[in-house]
């Protein structure tokens, strides 16, 4: 659960060894063999640490009044994982719902973490013969329509980045790329100068699992990038070896995921938009592209 570790900075917690040996080995397998991103591997790591704590309390290895967050997740061997039953897993799902207040989607994700862990123990490294999660289905999800900005709200957001920001060229450019290219946050933050091909009007992005894809740049993106890069490349004190496309104003180094989220959230609030997140811009891009083929330009903002 996110209250135990900072899930925004998975690299900070490497080598992810504050767990039982089987969990540590599994997380390494996810990154090295399965090709999962650090964020994905870290999510599984956090989920399995939490399950370890729960099982220690359920088996009486700590006193009943011990807070889950205070239980050491280490010290569980392969034999212990082999002793886990389907009933234990059902009780864990009930715990997530009743004590932790998890949404169905969060509970389903944590169950998926257990599915993956036991599949690894049974089918990848042959340490166990039975998978107690094999027949357990995730909670039925409520159907919720994706939330996205309307065309008018998107224009308001773009205008906000130009009037409320201390680095308007950068913030406007980031939002234009979000809205037109449907980038993930990690893809935008991870962009290097060498990934941009202005002549071919495309950007190389690295998504989940380090998968590479090329994204076309329309006129709006080209204009926003040119204006921002002209500003970026003439900033006093900028290290000429800095590869990151989007940098901070003060330290002139790669901007972080969290900082982008803060900037976008601030621009949304200034535009009177509530209940939206950076990820919703990805939904907005796909929806508006389908509905109107709308292009966002500086003239419209």
Label every PLM stretch briefly:
Residues 1-299:
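Conserved catalytic core of the tyrosine transesterase superfamily
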């Amino acid at each position: 659960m996110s209250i135990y570790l900072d899930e925004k900075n998975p690299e900070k917690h490497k080598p992810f060894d504050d767990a039982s040996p089987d969990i540590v080995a599994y997380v390494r397998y996810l990154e090295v063999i399965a090709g999962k991103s650090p964020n994905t591997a870290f999510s599984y790591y956090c989920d399995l640490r939490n399950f370890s704590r729960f099982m220690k309390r359920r088996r009486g290895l700590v006193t009943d009044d011990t807070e889950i967050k205070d239980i050491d997740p280490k010290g569980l061997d392969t034999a212990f994982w082999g002793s886990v039953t389907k009933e234990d897993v059902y009780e864990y799902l009930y715990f997530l719902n009743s004590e932790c207040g998890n949404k169905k989607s969060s509970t389903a994700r944590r169950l998926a973490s257990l599915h993956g862990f036991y599949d690894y123990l049974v089918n990848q490294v042959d340490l166990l013969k039975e998978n107690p999660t094999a027949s357990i289905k995730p909670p039925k999800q409520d159907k919720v329509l994706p939330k996205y900005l309307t065309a008018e709200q998107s224009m308001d957001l773009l205008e906000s980045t130009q009037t409320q920001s201390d680095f308007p060229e950068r913030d406007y450019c980031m939002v234009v790329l979000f809205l037109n290219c449907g980038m993930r946050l990690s893809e935008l933050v991870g962009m290097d100068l060498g990934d941009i091909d202005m002549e071919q009007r495309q950007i190389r992005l690295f998504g989940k699992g380090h998968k590479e894809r090329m994204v076309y740049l329309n006129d709006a993106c080209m204009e926003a990038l040119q204006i921002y890069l002209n500003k970026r490349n003439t900033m006093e004190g900028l290290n000429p070896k800095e590869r990151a496309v989007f940098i901070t104003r003060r330290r002139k180094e790669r901007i972080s995921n969290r900082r982008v989220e803060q900037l976008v959230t601030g621009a949304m609030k200034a535009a009177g938009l509530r209940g939206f997140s950076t990820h919703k811009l990805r939904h907005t891009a796909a929806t508006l592209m389908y509905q109107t083929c709308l292009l966002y330009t500086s003239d419209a903002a």
